[in-house]
From Swiss-Prot:
Cytoplasm found in the keyword field: yes
High-level lineage: Bacteria, Bacillati, Bacillota, Bacilli, Lactobacillales
Purpose: Modulates RecA activity.
Protein name per its UniProtKB record: Regulatory protein RecX
GO cellular component term, pick one: cytoplasm
Organism for this UniProt entry: Lactobacillus delbrueckii subsp. bulgaricus (strain ATCC 11842 / DSM 20081 / BCRC 10696 / JCM 1002 / NBRC 13953 / NCIMB 11778 / NCTC 12712 / WDCM 00102 / Lb 14)
Length: 271
């Protein structure tokens, strides 16, 4: 049996050093000190020392986890990973997580609902990306689907419009179909389905404006001409056709330009 010969407070508030048989043995929190009533002269068996150290590890894990949660909500996996990074044993981490779950501080279902709500309010991700992000955070599939279930297509469309509204500034600069393509590509990359992406695009840019389309064609024609005018006529025409096609203009529109219907070809140098 070892005897506690000294209990001294550390400079760090709430921490205490325990000396057994005149030698430093371990340190504990105030919570552990009170739980085991650790006082000078107390005898401790090896089993009791292990019990104290085990309790202290759990208390440390709980304190670390609570501090981590104080900044923002977390998932069970995030807290478990955080404790592991701080060299908390698996058993102590599990006890801390169970305690915080029992107290209601850890709740993956509530976290998933809040995550979805925040995305609807200020985020720019579609359901696919939200689902993927929650899976990375360790949330169970059933909880993810439950959180997504009440979100309507109209609500997702609102998120999608927020994501791609900056592309509206390209109207009149590139062809409408190219604006549509860019919007849908961006929406798909952020987890929106094809049908949602199409609905958002159609709602934002319902139909082509003839004046805007003509202005966009003229703008790109001038860019293309300046870029390729050094080539021989045949090569220049081919390169300009490819350039304009890549910017969303139809074959008929491109042909109309190449025969001088949009801008007389002899006037291109004047622009």
């Amino acid at each position: 049996m070892a005897i506690i010969t000294k209990v001294s407070a550390q400079k760090r508030q709430g921490r205490y050093n325990i000396f057994l048989d005149q030698e430093y043995a371990f340190s504990v929190s105030e919570k552990t000190l009170a739980e085991f009533v650790l006082l000078k002269g107390q005898e401790l068996s090896p089993q009791k020392i292990n019990e104290i150290l085990d309790y202290e590890a759990s208390a440390k894990a709980s304190d670390l986890a609570a501090r981590y949660l104080s900044y923002q909500p977390r998932t069970i996996k995030e807290v478990t990973d955080y404790l592991s990074q701080h060299e908390i044993s698996r058993s102590a981490a599990k006890r801390a997580v169970n305690e915080l779950t029992h107290l209601g501080y850890l709740d993956d279902a509530a976290y998933a609902r809040l995550f979805v709500k925040n995305n609807l309010q200020v985020g720019k991700n579609g359901p696919g990306a939200v689902r993927r992000d929650l899976k990375k955070k360790g949330v169970d599939d059933d909880l993810i689907e439950a959180a997504l279930a009440d979100v309507t297509d109209e609500e997702w469309a609102g998120v999608g419009k927020r994501l791609v509204k900056s592309l509206l500034g390209q109207q009149g600069k590139i062809a409408k179909r190219e604006v549509d393509r860019k919007m849908q590509t961006k929406l798909l990359s952020h987890g929106f389905s094809g049908s949602l992406a199409q609905a958002v695009t159609q709602d934002l840019v319902p139909e082509a404006d003839e004046d805007q389309e003509r202005a966009a064609l003229v703008k790109q024609v001038l860019k293309a001409y300046k870029r390729f005018k050094r080539y021989e006529p045949g090569v220049r025409e081919q390169k300009m056709r490819q350039y304009l096609y890549s910017h969303g203009f139809s074959g008929d529109e491109i042909s109309a330009f190449l025969v001088g219907e949009i801008i007389p070809l002899e006037e291109l140098e004047e622009y």
